[in-house]
Amino acid sequence: MTLNQLLKQNQSFYGASVIAGEDCLDREVKSVMVLEAADIENWGKPGQLLLTSFYALQILDAENSRKFFINMQKIGICGIVLKLGRLISDIPPYIMDYCNYYHIPLITVPKTTQYETMILSIMEPLMRQMLRKQSTMQRYNDLVGD
């Protein structure tokens, strides 16, 4: 599923707004992770969608934020979902600038949006897709034989 499909078809993203990186909404979402630490180079994966309330990013100055976004681009992170109103009510302009410059979609959701709901709504279709592939492979193996 792409970010665009996720935003249009998923009720858990009701009230979401794309505020930067609009040109990259065709990226495929392969997994989802809550951003708790800025050492993304140690755990980030291509196609990962990051959920955050800005907690891990608030300690970064502009230069370290730039490095964080460079690492996100290198890894292939598909986007960031930021819960506004929990820790911050306004996004620092340099964050939006980096998202646009490094082509990383920045999506805001209301503070009432629950991480659990977003994570489940992303992982359920991904798991169904994986199970379908596994079932297809099993049928093929059954037909071909061992």
Describe every region a protein language model picked out.
Residues 1-146:
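Alpha-helical/coil-rich non-catalytic "connector" segments in signaling and regulatory proteins
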